[in-house]
Amino acid sequence: MKLNSNVKIVAKKCILVPYEPCHVAKYHKWMENEEIRRLTGSEQLSLDEEYEMQKTWRNDEDKLTFIVLEMNESGEEVDHMLGDVNLFISTSPSTENPSDDVITGEVEVMIAEPRGRGKGIGEEAVRVIIAWAYENLKIEQFCVKITDDNTPSLSLFKKKLGFKQIGYSTAFKEFTFELPKNRLISEFSSFLEKNAEIKEYK
């Protein structure tokens, strides 16, 4: 998404930056891992295809992508990459009033580097992207789809972030969860102001 092309968000446990060409080779290496592809529902692409995908994501108004970096701004940025966090943006019926259509952000987070797991980095990255999208894109409905064997993600979204189950697909063995509106307002609406600094990404 062009809207975040110059946005850098420095939080307490991680830094979020736009997905740039310099990140593609490392991202492609992550996607060579079959388990990561399975859990993220991703297809294996060639490196050239990955570069084309990065260009597409950059210009796609329906996809918001940040690369997750560890808290270290020295040296090469690519050396500090831990994963990514995304929003897939669409219009769907409101769960509060199905006759009304609302803009919905479907969340996806991946901490691909083992050194970045179990430290609350994925949780913070999700909180940051939701708070940023709520404030800048006026998105007020957020959901996530998680396969029923992805225990870490189920724990993250249910227990730590407070998402509530609204559906289950037996065909895909996949839960759908949604962030309650009251929790969005009480916990996420002021998260950036209290926990992060917005900078210009150069």
UniProtKB/Swiss-Prot annotation:
<keyword id="KW-0012">Acyltransferase</keyword>
<dbReference type="InterPro" id="IPR016181">
    <property type="entry name" value="Acyl_CoA_acyltransferase"/>
</dbReference>
<feature type="domain" description="N-acetyltransferase">
    <location>
        <begin position="34"/>
        <end position="184"/>
    </location>
</feature>
<dbReference type="Pfam" id="PF13302">
    <property type="entry name" value="Acetyltransf_3"/>
</dbReference>
<dbReference type="InterPro" id="IPR000182">
    <property type="entry name" value="GNAT_dom"/>
</dbReference>
<dbReference type="InterPro" id="IPR039135">
    <property type="entry name" value="NAT9-like"/>
</dbReference>
<dbReference type="GO" id="GO:0008080">
    <property type="term" value="F:N-acetyltransferase activity"/>
</dbReference>
<protein>
    <recommendedName>
        <fullName>N-acetyltransferase 9-like protein</fullName>
        <ecNumber>2.3.1.-</ecNumber>
    </recommendedName>
</protein>
<keyword id="KW-0808">Transferase</keyword>
<comment type="similarity">
    <text>Belongs to the acetyltransferase family. GNAT subfamily.</text>
</comment>
